[in-house]
Amino acid sequence: MGWFFKDTNLVMLQTPHVFFSPDPFERNLDTFHRMPNEGELFYGIVQDGNDLWNASFFCGSCAIIRRKELMEVGGIAVETVTEDAHTALKLSRLGYNTAYLEVPQAAGLATESLSGHVGQRIRWARGMAQIARTDNPLLGKGLKFGQRLCYLNAMLHFFYGLPRLVFLTAPLAYLFFDAHVFQATALMITAYALPHLAHASVTNSRIQGRFRHSFWNEVYESVLAWYIMRPVLVAFINPKMGKFNVTAKGGVIEKAYFDWTIARPYVVLLLLNLVGFAVGIGKLFFFSGDEVITLIINMVWTTYNVLLLGASVAVANESRQIRSTPRVAAALPAFLRFENGRTLVCKTEDFSQHGLGLSVPPDSDIPTGSRVSVSLFRSDEEGVFPAVVTFSGTGRLGVQFDNLSLQQQAELASLTFSRADAWISTWGTAQRDKPLRSLGSVVLIGLRGIGQLATSAFKSSTPRPVSPVSKDSTP
């Protein structure tokens, strides 16, 4: 809040969006807290860059906005489905300042399923295309040149759908039809393209190391490209089309399954690239000279696309999620009181809305079903909550809260989910990027995705045994 007193022209302060549950990429690929997620690049680097040019924008939550100035622009913008960014653009046009503080202050749930994740990104893409069409930052008054470029960059980002699909299919034009995508010799293409690709990879790795690993941008874009291409193009032509949808969050996935519906575009593209690669192998026996080099270049390109599409397929393999409320890893001081007067000092391993995982001395003999009072602390504040022991193991204890009142639930949230230090400890702490290691992880996940696709296809095609009808059964 101090920045609002220091700068009376400041109308909006945005902080990062942090998620205490894994998104579909992190859960289905098992990369949670080991690899930066899709959104960390934006909140770790892009918004900081926007802030340099006074162009950081509102992202819907985790922000403070002055009410008086908000009313000057008619309140939250409703003309587009990305009302947050559009509202910030309107405020910037009036000459007000916006700011970004890269210190997590709150956290929330990520999307549970890939279909929900795709639906959310479709709305973002459609909304940004609507703003670009109806309130283009390059046009109109009030913005400085740097602000115009920053807002334009945010909007044009979601137009990657068509270029990404072209990238995933371009080498097939040569493999199937002998059509040259580039009118140049194979040697010239290699001489110009390889140094550029190597330089771009090293540069991005150095700049984005903590917030985006090499080659993962291609995976994210490959998953979303098919689904955002049409909404973006339609919204840019007719910005009034499309409606606002709220992203559903929270829930369980009782059984692991392969989402054939959402994966259909990736599967088709994957099969096309595999067939193209097979055609390329056949042509190796008939081509000669420079044609062989051109063929090999296109086959290498196709191999890369196969791995990207395999990774995209792997994301569609939804893993089981039986917890209705996610657990957040955190080491917080805790204190247990038993009914017989015994006390025990311990620490939390994780917490959720309904219970705690506790680290206790290995020799603690605590039977399952014991009723305890759990104390949690924040500075000089203490909260006491009734609980029941549901798990007791060597050095570990699981407790479930017992009929908390509304006031106790609010106090629990204050001592756990509302702690800013709980989110700072995991922000930007993923391993720094190493391009070769990152490429290796994409290759392995791509191969795993192809294997999962084959397994799921086999299971789907295998007829299920039919149980015989009993003679005594009635119609």
Where do the protein language model's features map onto the residues?
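Juxtamembrane inter-helical linkers in multi-pass membrane proteins
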Residues: P239-V252
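Active-site donor/metal-binding and catalytic loop motifs
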Residues: E102-G116
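Structured alpha-helical
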Residues: Y257-P475
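Intracellular alpha-helical coupling/juxtamembrane segments of multi-pass membrane proteins
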Residues: A110, H117-D135, F215-V232
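Long helical/loop segments within the catalytic core of UDP-sugar-dependent glycosyltransferases
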Residues: G2-V81, S92-R93, L114-N153
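Acidic donor-binding loop at a coil-to-helix junction in glycosyltransferase catalytic cores
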Residues: V81-T87
